[in-house]
Amino acid sequence: MKILTLAAILAVICIGCDKNTVDVNNPDVEEFVKQLKDGTYNNYAWTEGGERLWPVMPAFDRDDVPALLALAEDTELISPCDHFPVNPLSSMYPWRLVGSKPSIMLGEYLLWCAEAVIEGQDFASLNPVLIDEIRKPDQRLDSDEILSVRKLYQDWWNANGHLDNPPSLPLDGSGYGWH
């Protein structure tokens, strides 16, 4: 009887340990964001030889878009940022240098995740970098501009999120685009 009780307690403890891992096939957006912020996201692609490659993007779906857009109001710059899943095909580093620290703006990154879901792609572009294609095509957006773009996404989602084949994408005609 004591062995069964001990086994049950250990099972509960072990099950509780897994709650801090993001299931990339059925992700929890809030847990993903928490892990990005505290630097503990650790789902990586691996070689057959067991070498770590790059962080794997969770398989977000349309049900996750409202949470991604809601959490995109956070324009905190996160550093270190080497645990952020980015497009492995890109040769550009997606972060901003703040002082001498590479950082990723969380809100911009989450909008990029939402755009990928809306487009039905693994990644929205090569890089999670928003630009104003008309006025400042060679500069990244600042936090106020990111929040303006977030409003475009929210308005678009409210009007089109229920459609299987929306007539446009959130940034169409806005002058903003993904790098």
Cite the ranges covered by each PLM segment:
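Generic cytosolic/nucleocytoplasmic N-terminal low-complexity/intrinsically disordered segments
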Residues: 1, 18-19
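Sec-dependent signal peptide recognition
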Residues: 1-8
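C-terminal motif of bacterial Sec signal peptides marking the signal peptidase cleavage site
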Residues: 13-16
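Extended repeat-based scaffolds of very large eukaryotic assembly and lipid-transport proteins
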Residues: 20-179
